[in-house]
Amino acid sequence: MMRWFLLIGLASAAATDSSASFESRCQHFHKEIHLQNVHVHSTTYVPIGSNISMAYNPPICGGTSSSSISTIEFCQVALNVTTSDKSQFFMEAWLPSNYTGRFLSTGNGGLNGCVGYGDMIYASQYGFATIGTNNGHFGDTGQYFLNNPEVIEDFAYRALHTGTVVGKALTKLFYPQGYKNSYYLGCSTGGRQGWKSIQRFPDDFDGVVAGAPAFNFVNLCNWGSRFLKITGPPDSDTFVTSAQWSIIHNEIIRQCDALDGAVDGTIEDTDLCQPIFETLICNSTAVNKTSCLTGVQANTVNEVFSAMYGLDGKWLYPRMQPGSELAASFIYYSGNGFKYSDDWFKYVVYNDSNWDHSTWTLADAAAADAQDPFQISTFDGDISGFQKAGGKVLHYHGLEDAIITSDSSKAYYKHVADTMGLSPSDLDQFYRFFPISGMGHCSPGTGAASIGQGSSTYAGDDPQDNVLMAMVQWVEKGIAPEYVRGSKKSIDGQTEYRRKHCKYPKRNRYVGPGKYTDENAWKCV
């Protein structure tokens, strides 16, 4: 018995010594950082069970208060990196004591200038040395772009790339073994950033997990401006109310839900969904015209679900996929301008903070498209550099996305295939795309859409349930994901059912014999 107590005591002492050594290493780490254009604010030791400090996070990004309790021991490094005489970005590097030899960079969202702390918490728990930047400015607004192309360049690509270079250097300094593999995790603008790295800096990452990417970014901004032109303001005869959009949604589900073989309230393949809205036009005897559509309103809805073309007839951006209208009615169809599109035109295209979004026309679309600063559109179809570097990319997009249509991801996949002359099986060697039914914008919707892309969608560490772990397995073991399994969560966080989401261009089909909640009752066809 005495021997067991002695062993336990020795183990406890070793753990204490290890923590003390790690704490000391962290507290003195700033003395070792001598990187060009880098100013270190602090290196802070964060023990298990402590509140994670966000001391440099401004109120516009949520402020300095944090309700996150650290489940790991890590060294939190805060610093600024100068990119020009008119621009700089803030970044943090989290260096965990449970380090696995993996480096990971996180992305941003919207016109976001806020560090993705949620993703940093998620990745560092897995032992990744993790970084996040503010992408060149603080806050979720484009006003910092006004008359400052250097800040736009940081936002387009430079902050992520430079932050990755700095982050890798810090990782090598802190850990004697350096890093074995580098990864990226991001969604929305973060998805675009991941793809920009693939296109422009193919050696930055071995594995990229990119969700709902803001591909074709400038025309995405044009697309966001176009909806006000289609719907008109709330007092116009073309406007469709949120209550009517609910009716429209029910009609879309009625027409399209069963196309995949199961009636479950979720559309598995939006390409098959081509709804006819004339079924909702009020008849001549209708008393309550708010429960149906006028002919003019039906035309509005048809336009909403149509692709955007330029003045010269050139395709600019795909349609909004059906199934997203309940959320989109408050984002795009509310009779107001879309904030991100509004900011892009005010502070980038025209450098005029008084520009009125209600004046937008296809001529403005042409001006913005021609400008495309620093190729921010991120629509290059040749990713052969990434292929040759041995990189892998797992691309996903929710089929209920109400901010960035999933048709944009399908268009990009086809663009890559056409540009590189590769078949789906050829692309599978390094690029796999998974449309996720029942997923909204980077987050769950009506279906089995928790796929482990972040803490809020955690569904286990098994690679089939976790896109980050699936990428690690692909890069390090050569086992590529054949499907992504999503979980449908109840309000209390319990798993109601799971579904395997197919690798594009295959689609999910219910074949039975079990219920639609049985993951084995579905087949990729």
From Swiss-Prot:
Its EC number is 3.1.1.73. GO terms for biological process: xylan catabolic process. The keyword Transferase does not apply. Ca(2+) binds at residues 257, 260, 262, 264. Pfam families: Tannase (PF07519). The active site is at residues 188, 401, 441. Residues 1-20 form the signal peptide. Keywords: Calcium, Carbohydrate metabolism, Disulfide bond, Glycoprotein, Hydrolase, Metal-binding, Polysaccharide degradation, Secreted, Serine esterase, Signal, Xylan degradation. GO terms for molecular function: feruloyl esterase activity; metal ion binding. It is found in: Secreted. Disulfide bonds join 26-75, 61-114, 187-442, 256-273, 282-292, 502-524. It catalyses: feruloyl-polysaccharide + H2O = ferulate + polysaccharide. SUPFAM superfamilies: alpha/beta-Hydrolases (SSF53474). Glycans are attached at residues 51, 80, 98, 283, 288, 351. It is an enzyme of class 3 (hydrolase). GO terms for cellular component: extracellular region. The keyword Transport does not apply. Belongs to the tannase family. Involved in degradation of plant cell walls. Hydrolyzes the feruloyl-arabinose ester bond in arabinoxylans as well as the feruloyl-galactose and feruloyl-arabinose ester bonds in pectin. This is Probable feruloyl esterase B-1. It comes from Neosartorya fischeri (strain ATCC 1020 / DSM 3700 / CBS 544.65 / FGSC A1164 / JCM 1740 / NRRL 181 / WB 181) (Aspergillus fischerianus). The gene is faeB-1.
